[in-house]
């Protein structure tokens, strides 16, 4: 796995170096040489970050760890962007493009169950629940790779032109409910405009990708991610006499089935892929009392804006109609988190 990570990191460097070199002849061996030297450090950084993960908008120690290293390279470092974001700037003092490299820093509320010396033992509170914290999505690797890229490109400074902006983004998984954060907030705070960035390059590791390869394509590449919350309201009653109330648990279960019907029967999957998943459902406080309300929360993934709008309308219609048909009501809220990751065809080619 580490070899896969480091190969991807090396290839990512190769993507941007041609934009920054006055002449491209011989840059591959030079990058390979420097990447090989930094490999032990990348492994060390990744294991440290993996052992001490932090949730979205709570990446305080991670940001401090990253900023301290970037400052040791002599880079201009900015902290506190979008709460915990870190930006470092490498100026070659020669005219050329401004190219950004980006990595995400946050972990997930997941208990790590592997027996490794650098396994996470961290715990935190998420939405009122005590949870384990784990880098289950590879962001520890992304951060370590970008730290390595910063070192390699700093060592190549005299050979480059233009400027490199290293962006370490918090809250890629989405800011906690009621908070702002992530890429949108970084952009709003001027991380691109203030630095006059011409292009941004990023990557995401994938355990399904063959070791030693990298996959990319022009256009829509990674799906938009939206969050939805559905509150089903019925009528509370005793579990022994359900006919005297309106059971929101049963209504919610039918809505969940209906959401899957949207994807499997109302979406033309030969033209566009889509996913609707419910990740949380909560209601009631006692086993023998039918609750008044059930709340569910989930995610919507699409690769095209038109499909995104259609699914939003379908979810509203499905939830409210099913609830009404069973004597209940459903309130639907949909939050657009991140748009489709769109690769500029010119930069991709």
Enumerate the predicted regions with their spans.
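Bacterial N-terminal signal peptides that target proteins for export
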Residues: 1-10
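Bacterial N-terminal signal peptides
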Residues: 9-22
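Metal-dependent amide/peptide-bond hydrolase catalytic core
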Residues: 24, 72, 253-349
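Soluble non-cytosolic domains of exported or imported proteins
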Residues: 36-40, 53-64, 136, 140, ...
């Amino acid at each position: 796995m580490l070899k896969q990570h480091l190969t991807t990191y090396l290839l990512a460097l190769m993507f941007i170096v041609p934009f920054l070199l006055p002449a491209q002849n011989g840059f591959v061996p030079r990058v390979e040489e420097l990447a090989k030297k930094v490999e032990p450090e990348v492994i060390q950084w990744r294991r440290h970050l993996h052992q001490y993960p932090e949730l979205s908008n709570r990446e305080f120690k991670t940001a401090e760890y990253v900023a301290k290293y970037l400052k040791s390279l002599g880079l201009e470092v900015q902290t506190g962007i979008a709460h915990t974001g870190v930006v470092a700037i490498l100026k070659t003092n020669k005219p050329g493009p401004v190219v950004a490299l980006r990595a995400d820093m946050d972990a997930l509320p997941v208990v790590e169950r592997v027996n490794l010396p650098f396994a996470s033992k961290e715990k935190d509170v998420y939405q009122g629940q005590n949870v384990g914290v784990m880098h289950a999505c590879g962001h520890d690797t992304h951060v370590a790779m970008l730290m390595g890229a910063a070192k390699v490109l700093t060592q190549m400074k005299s050979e480059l032109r233009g400027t490199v902006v290293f962006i370490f983004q918090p809250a890629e998984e989405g800011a906690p409910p009621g908070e702002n954060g992530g890429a949108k907030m970084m952009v709003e705070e001027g991380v691109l405009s203030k630095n006059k960035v011409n292009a941004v390059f990023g990557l995401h590791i994938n355990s399904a990708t063959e070791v030693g390869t990298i996959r990319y394509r022009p256009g829509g590449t990674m799906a938009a991610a939206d969050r939805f919350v559905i509150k089903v309201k019925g009528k509370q009653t005793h579990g022994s006499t359900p006919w005297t109330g309106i059971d929101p648990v049963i209504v919610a279960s039918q809505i969940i089935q209906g959401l899957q019907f949207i994807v499997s029967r109302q979406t033309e999957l030969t033209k566009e892929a889509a996913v609707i998943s419910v990740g949380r459902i909560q209601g009631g406080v006692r086993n023998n009392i039918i609750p008044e309300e059930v709340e569910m929360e989930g995610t919507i993934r699409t690769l095209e804006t038109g499909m995104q709008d259609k699914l939003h309308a379908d979810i509203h219609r499905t939830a409210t109609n099913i609830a009404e048909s069973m004597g209940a009501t459903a309130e639907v809220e949909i939050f657009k988190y991140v748009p489709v990751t769109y690769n500029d065809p010119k930069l991709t080619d």
